[in-house]
Amino acid sequence: MKITKIEKKKRLYLIELDNDESLYVTEDTIVRFMLSKDKVLDNDQLEDMKHFAQLSYGKNLALYFLSFQQRSNKQVADYLRKHEIEEHIIPDIITQLQEEQWIDDTKLADTYIRQNQLNGDKGPQVLKQKLLQKGIASHDIDPILSQTDFSQLAQKVSQKLFDKYQEKLPPKALKDKITQALLTKGFSYDLAKHSLNHLNFDQDNQEIENLLDKELDKQYRKLSRKYDGYTLKQKLYQALYRKGYNSDDINCKLRNYL
């Protein structure tokens, strides 16, 4: 087969053959196989060229994808599939990228966890789940998590939550709120409870009473639209108790309120 035309098309070259076949190749392919117009290729040379062209094009795609941020092996492979790189070539591309240190799942996991320590608010359980979703294996994640101390981060997150809710909730509800938030963010129960020891939950009676008054007004506006009488009183009691207020304080307020 003879090459009848070579034409540059943006980042690729269009090659046309005298058997009416055409294909796109990278500049690396042109150089490697010393392609030029009127060059004759046998079947083996043509297949070698096609394979290398796919490999070269796929690698260029992957490098473009990696230029924005670190990616896992799986993320790169999925990206190549999306761009219709042949399945049997993808492992070769991944291997080359690994050998040249463009991709490394262990380093990616380490960087992700370190960045979270500096700027994030996630505990180890959520971090692991997010890394698994990126296609990183547990054996690349677990050693890094086990060597990472999350106690200071848990304290930092708990302090931020404390500052946000301390003027809105009584001590018991505030503790529950912070604990549940930390659990949701992936911290262990022990770490969540330990982080509370660094916070001052002391509130004087007047502060608690003011909070109770505000919450009672809020719940009354909401519940009085649907209930009245004894049922309203019960609903108010239940709502306030769930918020963490003392039972005696609630009953006292309700006697004077209704």
UniProtKB/Swiss-Prot annotation:
Keyword hit for Transmembrane: no
HAMAP family named among the record's database cross-references: RecX
Keywords in alphabetical order: Cytoplasm
Pfam family, one: RecX_HTH2
Organism, scientific name: Streptococcus pyogenes serotype M4 (strain MGAS10750)
Gene Ontology biological process terms from the UniProt entry: regulation of DNA repair
Designated name of the protein: Regulatory protein RecX
UniProt signal peptide: none
